[in-house]
Amino acid sequence: MGNVFRCYVEKKPGFAVEAEHLFGELRHTLGLTGLTGVRVLRRYDVEGVDAAVYAAARTTVLSEPQVDDLWDEVMPAPEGEHTLLAVEALPGQYDQRADSCAQCIQMMHGGERPTVRAATVYVLEGTLTAQEAAKARGYLINPVESREAALDKPATLRQDYPVPAAVPVLEGFTALDRAGLEGVLAQYALAMDLADLAFLQAYFRDEEGRDPTLTEVRVVDT
């Protein structure tokens, strides 16, 4: 179940209220007179379920067949001049749409919760200059919570974060003599003087019973 399934969902003509409203805003509020139409599609990437579960979810959780058109993997190529823009939540930003879909799919099949990533794809039909396209992007992307999404499907939705490097410990610090402490001051270019470093040494030796990390020394030194 390592496959990523992708689908695009768009309201059928007569139900595309959001697209019609957005067209009016972009054309009249932003003055994009070259804009001739707007399409709004929801894009879903799903990982962690098998093909049978996905097939059931695509028409029960991800779309409503009565009012939605749905395409698997790729959306129909837009005709004529157009600008394509995909927008997704920033990493770490709560995405209610994706989370709700993941919960519903989990309840539907009774297994582990899948990973769902959602994005909104805008098709801006008509001829837009580079400046007008940038204006539309600025209007559609709130940088506090969203960003422009890649158009290609990822191989996986898993996000691997690098393991932070271990914080170095100043081994033997609490046993250093005066010359050793002077060496620490020079090696790490510390701003504190010898008396301050000796006080820090006594604290870690007598109160903490251990050698400090370099980070702890840097914090005291600032």
Where do the protein language model's features map onto the residues?
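Core nucleic-acid recognition elements
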Residues: 1-222
